[in-house]
Amino acid sequence: MIKIDHVTYRYDEEHTALKDISLEINKGEMLAIVGHNGSGKSTLAKHLNALLLPTEGRVEVDGMDTAVEANTLNIRKKVGMVFQNPDNQIVTTIVEEDVAFGPENLGVPPEEIRRRVNEALKAVGMEAYARSAPHMLSGGQKQRIAIAGMLAMEPEVLVLDEATAMLDPQGRREVLDIVGRLNRERGMTVVMITQYMEEALSADRVIVMADGRLIAQGTPREVFSRGRELRANGLDLPPIAMLRDKLIDGGMNIPADVITAEELAEAICPLK
């Protein structure tokens, strides 16, 4: 659905943020892109709906080249983005009006806008707050409203660019639960950009970036079994994977691909 072909991006002559990235994002996939600050993951995210254009290489969304200006509107209809700070995406003083803002700008008929707003608020569990003021909501609730605003545009792909970074643990869980449900129940393609490795455990595939390059990819189990390699690139592991590696280093015979608490407990129990 999205094809990234040998993409390099330079902010200026001295700063190359992406270095020869090639990647395909499949329809209906839950993809996590992880890396430390400055790894290039957010720069890559902004290429997915033509907010940034490659210095070299090519990005296609359903066959549409993002560098062709005539394609921009259709690409942004297909690929919606939710950013780190929900306050930057909330533009009105009433929740339902904010969710309606995008469809209104697309010229969607009023009856269709009402349907989309109702469905979007229901999808994120915020229908009871339709007439509320966004500034009175918690961070997690605001981010759910930002997601609802994207859903009302009816995109095929939802990109979350560190959308949980400013939230407390409860807010993060709320957002991740909603995104997971959209992927499972609606078949929506989801791309999660995150520095929280545990968030990537729910993905179908994990992409690891460092210094503007793609350095690893695979299922969460495949990627997070490579603990030493990831740590060598300055990356953390999910807490269970970190504990697993410490136990292995301490001499315990535990499979290197254990990534959940249940699996770790099952591996440890026979050793007692």
Each model region followed by its residue ranges:
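Conserved ABC ATPase signature
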Residues: 133-137, 141
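Catalytic Walker B motif of ABC-type/P-loop ATPase nucleotide-binding domains
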Residues: 158-161
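ABC ATPase NBD Q-loop/coupling interface
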Residues: 58-74
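The feature captures the beta-strand-to-loop junction immediately N-terminal to the Walker
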Residues: 34-36
